[in-house]
Amino acid sequence: MQFLVALLLLSVAVARALPSASKPNNTSSENNPPIQPSTPLPPGVDISQQVKTNRPTDQRLESDKEGQDKTVARTSASVSSGVESATNLNLDDSKKHPETADAKLKETLQQLLPVDPKQEKSGQKFTKDSGSPTGGDSDNTTGGDSNKTTGVDSDKTSGGDSNKPTGSDNDKPTGGDSNKPTSKVPSNTETPKIDKVQLTEKGQKPTLISKTESGEKLAGDSDFSLKPEKGDKSSEPTEDVETKEIEEGDTEPEEGSPLEEENEKVLGPSSSENQEGTLTDSMKDEKDDHYKDNSGNTSAESSHFFAYLVTAAVLVAVLYIAYHNKRKIIAFALEGKRSKVTRRPKASDYQRLNLKL
């Protein structure tokens, strides 16, 4: 695809170059009348002689312009034929190998472009033959414009446009984008490590470490009594501790320092024992809670199980009795219904019968 885009740009540039090269030549011949010398003529020279000398220069200009138009037409035909041949031959190769296709394109353009220096040489020869006034004008109109239109435009289309899709687009994903993630990842990973080191140096995290160490040593060793107190004090603000120490130092004498140490030693084991007791009590309470939960779950399951067993046993007993006493149950039901329909005669009924008789 890049190769096809470059070919289209080349064809557009050549199409623009041809009319632009022909227009300046026509305008220069129409707009530039025969130049008259600014210096005064000598008295012995006639104006007719000077006009005769200028006429051959005009004829030479026209012949040279025709030759340049022919060369431009030839170069355009050769460029178009070269482009068509390159497209016909290298379409398959460009799809398979775009780099080799770009290299071949550059080679063909380099082979076709060296026609321009010949035009420059012809323009220089023309200036030498025709003289200073006509040579300068002809170079400005024909040589400069033809070089600008053919050489510069073809270079722009071939060099700039053909290299843009290959160089810049191919280099961006490999060079720029591939290096960015690799450079950013280590920076992100290194920053938390540096922050951790700085925090430990400043003394922000030793409080947590002291708490964990104090908790472990309370469970393990009961002799170290001062460290748990320090761990408890570490949670308090540092400013309050400093103010308390200053007040104690001002109010109490120096002799009271050993007494304080003894009091701390006396209070240390008791506080450590109390803390150990609280820890053990909390552990026991947690264990009891676990046991209670487990026992409650097991008892609930067992109670449901026994209830199901009892109900099943009662149902089995009732069904067994009913199966073996079918006749009695049926006779009892039938006799009850008959007794309601047929009654036994009472004594009063018999007495009434006797009276009638």
UniProtKB/Swiss-Prot annotation:
Residues 133-180 are annotated as: 6 X 8 AA tandem repeats of [PT]-[TS]-G-[GVS]-D-[SN]-[DN]-[NK]. The modification Phosphoserine is found at S234, S235, S271. Keywords: Glycoprotein, Golgi apparatus, Membrane, Methylation, Phosphoprotein, Repeat, Signal, Transmembrane, Transmembrane helix. The modification Dimethylated arginine is found at R74. Residues 34-43 have a biased composition (Pro residues). GO terms for biological process: Golgi to endosome transport. The keyword DNA damage does not apply. Residues 18-303 are lumenal. Residues 23-33, 73-91, 159-168, 176-191, 269-281 have a biased composition (Polar residues). It is found in: Golgi apparatus, trans-Golgi network membrane. Residues 129-146 have a biased composition (Low complexity). It is a single-pass membrane protein. Sequence repeats lie at residues 133-140, 141-148, 149-156, 157-164, 165-172, 173-180. Changing Y350A: No effect on neurabin-1 and neurabin-2 binding. It comes from the Eukaryota. Residues 55-72, 92-101, 117-128, 192-204, 213-246, 282-293 have a biased composition (Basic and acidic residues). Residues 20-101, 113-299 are annotated as: Disordered. Pfam families: KCT2 (PF17818). This is Trans-Golgi network integral membrane protein TGN38.
